[in-house]
Design a protein with these regions (language model features):
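PLP-dependent amino-acid enzyme catalytic core
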Residues: 1-182
Length: 187
């Protein structure tokens, strides 16, 4: 790395590009195929760019301020990114995971200071799972109700419906790919 950074957010996305020479040879390709090694992001999560972008978008809209609590459902990757950036920006994070998610992911989340819940800790979700009425929308609504019921400001970042999640790639991925290749345009 050629520069000194002052916060973890400055490290996001500037991950190495690697030419996939073996793949090119195996498939007799004339074009170069590049892979972006996203696991080199600061938290080790491939979702760091999206997690940071969702937090930045919420801050810009005035939906988050230091001391607030972010809530999200995660299987791990987005949650790990959210945990890293929540900690560095002065937010608390509570994540809800499906039963059976790896202990290692839970430990990483906790190491960043996140509180980890299992989705069935929400009684209405446990009931919906048991009686067969569970849907993703029901779960999203239950998480929003959980946030609304808290005595302090809780913000459901809602990666599934948050435009800043895919927006991270429209806004940033092309830049992070085209700058090191000096092409300006990738096809």
């Amino acid at each position: 790395m050629s520069k000194i950074v002052t916060n973890i957010a400055e490290l996001v996305g500037n991950t190495p590009l690697m030419e996939l020479v073996g793949y090119e040879k195996k498939h007799d390709l004339k074009a170069k195929v590049l892979g972006k090694l996203e696991y080199f992001n600061p938290s080790g999560s491939i979702k760091d760019r999206a997690a940071l972008n969702m937090i930045l978008a919420a801050e810009e809209k005035g939906l988050l301020k230091p001391g607030d609590t972010i809530v999200e459902n995660t299987s791990g990757n987005t949650g790990i990114g959210l945990a890293a950036f929540s900690a560095s920006r002065g937010y608390k994070l509570e994540v809800f995971m499906e039963p059976g998610q790896s202990i290692e992911r839970q430990q990483i989340l906790k190491a960043y200071g996140a509180t980890v819940h299992i989705m069935t800790d929400l009684p209405e979700v446990a009931k919906a799972l048991a009686d067969g009425t569970f849907t993703v929308q029901f779960y999203q609504d239950a998480l929003q109700r959980y946030c609304d019921a808290q005595p302090t400001h809780y913000y459901f970042i809602n990666q599934l419906a948050n435009e800043a999640n895919p927006g991270a790639h429209y806004d940033l991925s092309l830049i992070h790919i085209s700058e090191p290749t000096r092409l300006g345009m990738i096809s």
